[in-house]
């Protein structure tokens, strides 16, 4: 006789892939510890944190929660490409302000921009996509009263953008909270990084490639950014790379060639 004990409400597949959720949860906590292991100060993050499918996923969820997205000139181009008319540089019109730190436009500290944004008393999302490939950057967010979310990604550190995974710290109610409670984990991207966090610290890329970046920038007569992928310039020669007030030259291929990566 068929028992009704195994009848459930949610739609579940007949065959379920065997996944070790203990390893997944362990990775989530290891990721948090890894972030805080940097020689750069990391303080003042929201207490709740969730694994996301990279920061792009976190942005898409943010777009669902807030209508007008405020940004500074030179910010990460995805926001305008994805949201078009919902993105504004008039922060007084924004429902949330997204700021990359280091800043996408030059790879330098964004604390000056965060201070300005904080005066608007609107929720702030800090995008730390360049964490793990930067130096001399202070990630102390305790001075600010309006930071609701801070996101980190491993794509730039490990070159693993095709296996995206990030960690979103937030005081807001994001859809990812529902994912987690309903057992919709981002296992594939996380699994790719299970052992990688043990092989490199958040400062390893700078230690390995920082001097090469400086050498290349010297040869090109440009200024090294605090994010090692970039050199900065204000001449007409490189104006096609202009991002906001600065020409941002991505030299990652040159670094790879120089080091025979």
What annotation goes with each model-predicted range?
Residues 1-27, 34-261:
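PLP-dependent class I/II
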């Amino acid at each position: 006789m068929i028992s009704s004990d195994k009848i459930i409400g949610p739609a579940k597949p007949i065959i379920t892939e065997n996944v070790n959720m203990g390893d997944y949860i362990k990775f989530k906590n290891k990721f948090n510890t890894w972030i805080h292991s940097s020689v750069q100060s990391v303080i003042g993050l929201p207490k709740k944190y969730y694994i996301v499918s990279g920061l792009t996923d976190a942005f898409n969820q943010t777009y669902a929660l807030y209508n007008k997205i405020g940004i500074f000139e030179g910010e990460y181009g995805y926001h305008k490409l994805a949201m078009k008319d919902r993105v504004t540089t008039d922060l007084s019109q924004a429902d949330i302000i997204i700021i990359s730190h280091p800043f996408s436009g030059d790879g330098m500290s964004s604390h000056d921009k965060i201070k300005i944004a904080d005066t608007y008393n609107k929720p702030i999302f800090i995008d730390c996509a360049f964490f793990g490939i930067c130096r001399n950057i202070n990630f102390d967010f305790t001075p600010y009263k309006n930071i609701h979310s801070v996101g980190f990604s491993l794509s730039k550190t490990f070159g693993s953008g095709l296996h995206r995974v990030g960690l979103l710290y937030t005081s807001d109610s994001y859809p990812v909270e529902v994912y987690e409670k309903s057992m919709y984990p981002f296992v594939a991207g996380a699994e790719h990084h299970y052992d990688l966090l043990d092989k490199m610290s958040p400062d390893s890329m700078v230690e390995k490639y920082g001097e090469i970046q400086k050498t290349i920038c010297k040869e090109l007569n440009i200024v090294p950014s605090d994010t090692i992928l970039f050199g900065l310039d204000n001449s007409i020669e490189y104006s096609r790379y202009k991002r906001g007030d600065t020409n941002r030259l991505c030299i990652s291929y040159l670094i790879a060639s120089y080091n025979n990566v």
